[in-house]
Each structure stands twice: as structure tokens, then as C-alpha cells.
């Protein structure tokens, strides 16, 4: 990992297309601005981790929800079937 010290207004360049600017320093935090091509995805790590956790949670089996879905689909199918003659 490359560790750099920058002051407000100074920039860091990554490759030819990405520019990071130190906008402000406040207490123990800093504000940065990132200029990058539209095709480059930029995410905060905590947001990425929250999305991954939510996706894992959504992918887990829920037997109660499965039972409810099957019951709803069965009721719908029975409602659509014409009565026997």
C-alpha cells in the first residue's frame, strides 16, 4: 500500500484518468473529490459491504416465505381453473 500525505488542494493521480483532490480537512476526517471516467465505479467501502450483506441475506432460504408463495400461487391457479362440468 502506498501511503501519501497531502494538504488541502493537493492532488493524487492514478493512471491517466483518475484524479483525487483533498478538498478539506476537519478534525480526524478529510473530504476528497474524485474525478474519473464514467465507466469507473467508485464506492465507499462501508456501502459496498452493506450491499454485499444485504444480497447475502436476500439469497438465504426462508421456508415460511416459500410456503406462503406456494400457497398464493396454488390459490391463484385454482381461481383461474374453470369449474368442472
UniProtKB/Swiss-Prot annotation:
Instruction: Tell me the Gene3D superfamilies matching this sequence.
Output: Translational regulator CsrA
- Keywords in alphabetical order: Bacterial flagellum biogenesis, Cytoplasm, Repressor, RNA-binding, Translation regulation
Main location as per UniProt: cytoplasm
Where does it localize? Answer: Cytoplasm
UniProt xrefs under SUPFAM superfamilies: CsrA-like (SSF117130)
Question: GO annotations under biological process?
Answer: bacterial-type flagellum organization; mRNA catabolic process; negative regulation of translational initiation; regulation of bacterial-type flagellum assembly; regulation of carbohydrate metabolic process
Domain of life of the native organism: Bacteria
One GO cellular-component annotation of the UniProt record comes to: cytosol
Task: List, alphabetically, the InterPro entries matched.
Answer: CsrA, CsrA_sf
Q: Which GO terms describe its molecular function?
A: mRNA 5'-UTR binding
Protease in keyword set: no
What start and end residues bound the annotated signal peptide? none
Which protein family is it in?
Belongs to the CsrA/RsmA family.
This chain's function reads: A translational regulator that binds mRNA to regulate translation initiation and/or mRNA stability. Usually binds in the 5'-UTR at or near the Shine-Dalgarno sequence preventing ribosome-binding, thus repressing translation. Its main target seems to be the major flagellin gene, while its function is anatagonized by FliW.
Quaternary context: Homodimer; the beta-strands of each monomer intercalate to form a hydrophobic core, while the alpha-helices form wings that extend away from the core.
Tell me what this protein is called: Translational regulator CsrA
Gene name on record?
A: csrA
Amino acid at each position: 500500500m502506498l501511503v501519501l500525505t497531502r494538504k488541502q488542494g493537493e492532488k493524487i493521480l492514478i493512471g491517466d484518468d483518475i484524479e483525487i483532490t483533498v478538498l478539506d480537512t476537519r478534525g480526524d476526517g478529510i473530504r476528497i473529490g474524485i474525478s474519473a471516467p464514467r465507466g469507473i465505479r467508485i464506492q465507499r467501502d462501508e456501502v459496498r459491504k452493506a450491499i454485499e450483506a444485504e444480497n447475502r441475506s436476500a439469497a438465504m432460504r426462508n421456508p415460511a416465505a416459500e410456503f406462503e408463495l406456494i400457497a398464493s400461487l396454488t390459490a391463484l391457479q385454482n381461481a383461474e381453473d374453470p369449474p368442472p362440468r
